[in-house]
Amino acid sequence: MGEPIVEWLNQQQDNMVELLRDLVDIDSNSFNKAGVDLVGARLTAFFDDNEIPHETIPLEEYGNAIRAVVSGGDGNQPILLCGHRDTVFPTGEVEKRPFSIADGKAFGPGVADMKPGLVINAFILAAFHKFGGHPNPLVGLFTGCLLYTSPSPRDLH
């Protein structure tokens, strides 16, 4: 199971950078629900393109949550891949310093925070889905906000 997944992931670097560029180039301050939800929409488009089952869990004040599940075997111990879609950067930061790569390093709002982790989690889900899943379910939980919605995840089960 592992070798084809690793080979496929190794071939996805350009696609990973493209998804990262898309996510970084969206202003998604914690208090900008529309922007955070736009990051979520880009991720759900990725899940749709890769035929990964997912659902959006609406939250009123901050960004909605997204749950994507890749099943496979009959294991009953889910493996959680999680990350938040917001950044601390104010709306307008993307215009000042959009995603760029220089000397092999990525720059832009969120590249040193969770946005690369969102890309990694999305591609891990895609890889396992493509190759038949994992013995235990893989659950991707993409929350709207790291700090301000801490009571809200109780509603996500």
Predicted regions and their residues:
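Hydrophobic/aromatic residues located in beta-strands of well-ordered beta-sheets
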Residues: 138-140
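Acidic/His- and Gly-rich active-site-bordering loop/insert found
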Residues: 2-109, 129-136
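Single conserved hydrophobic/aromatic residue that forms the stacking wall/gate
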Residues: 148-157
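Acidic, glycine-rich active-site loops and adjacent beta-strand->loop/helix elements
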Residues: 85, 142-147
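Residues that form or flank phosphate/diphosphate-binding pockets in enzymes
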Residues: 34, 76, 115-116, 150
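Active-site alpha-helical elements of protease catalytic centers
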Residues: 110-125
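Glycine-/small-residue-rich active-site loops that bind phosphorylated ligands and cofactors
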Residues: 31, 113, 147
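Active-site catalytic microenvironments for nucleophilic, acid-base chemistry
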Residues: 124-131, 152
